[in-house]
């Protein structure tokens, strides 16, 4: 049943992507660069803290934003298949948990003007559901809710997001490569519609338990943004720490 559900969702997303892209190509686009550092600290096999430090820069206008994200997650649930693999945001091969619950807080400000152009505070909650397949293929569903306070007057709104992720690990001696693709529609309460869709393709590579590098190309289509079509190059440095207890 779950395998059939994943196949149906995948086919629907592929059809949605094809229909969306056909109406996009003729429109103007903007390009951005997104460098990021992610710090991970695992203190038990199931519990983990992390901090993201992402930046964004518009190549044409030079506009920049910076964010700080602090979050905690808890992995739980065993698959009927015993799966030992390195996932996108993991430092080493471990027995995979099929569910993950995450919560965190984000602060974003425009840079160079002390947040006068844009400022946001956001509390978010995530649920991840993972389905492993043969040949180290993994299909994940992520449901996320964002509670947002935007601007000087802290105007409240919320978003609901669903992300479908497909990834696969390849190993060669100590090197682990995890290519992936994902698609994510956003529902925004300010517009009472699905106004944004993101398509991402990339890979994560690691050859040591402490460091991993991730690179991806992101395309974003937003019908209610000042920039309707956005292309971004996202480069992420993952740095991992863990206690002795977490390694058991």
Report the location of each language-model feature.
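Start-of-domain marker
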Residues: 27-95
């Amino acid at each position: 049943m779950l395998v059939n559900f994943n196949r149906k969702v995948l086919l629907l997303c592929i059809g949605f992507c094809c229909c969306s892209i056909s109406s996009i190509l003729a429109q103007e686009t903007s390009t951005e660069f997104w460098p990021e550092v992610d710090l991970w600290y695992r203190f038990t096999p199931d519990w983990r803290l992390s901090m993201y430090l992402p930046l964004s820069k518009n190549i044409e206008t030079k506009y920049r934003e910076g964010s700080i994200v602090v979050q905690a997650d808890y992995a739980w649930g065993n698959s009927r298949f015993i799966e030992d693999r390195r996932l996108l945001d993991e430092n080493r091969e471990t027995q995979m948990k099929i569910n993950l619950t995450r919560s965190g807080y984000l602060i974003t400000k425009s840079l160079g003007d002390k947040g006068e152009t844009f400022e946001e505070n956001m509390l978010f909650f995530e649920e991840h559901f993972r389905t492993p397949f043969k040949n180290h293929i993994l299909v994940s569903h992520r449901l996320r809710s964002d509670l947002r306070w935007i601007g000087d007057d802290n105007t409240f709104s919320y978003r609901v997001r669903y992300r479908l992720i497909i990834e696969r690990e390849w190993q060669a001696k100590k090197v682990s490569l995890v290519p992936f693709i994902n698609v994510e529609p956003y529902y925004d309460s300010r517009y009472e519609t699905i106004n944004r869709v993101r398509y991402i393709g990339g890979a994560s590579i690691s050859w040591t338990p402490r460091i991993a590098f991730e690179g991806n190309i992101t395309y974003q289509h937003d019908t209610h943004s000042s920039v309707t079509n956005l292309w971004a190059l996202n480069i992420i440095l993952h740095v991992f720490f863990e206690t002795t207890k977490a390694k058991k």
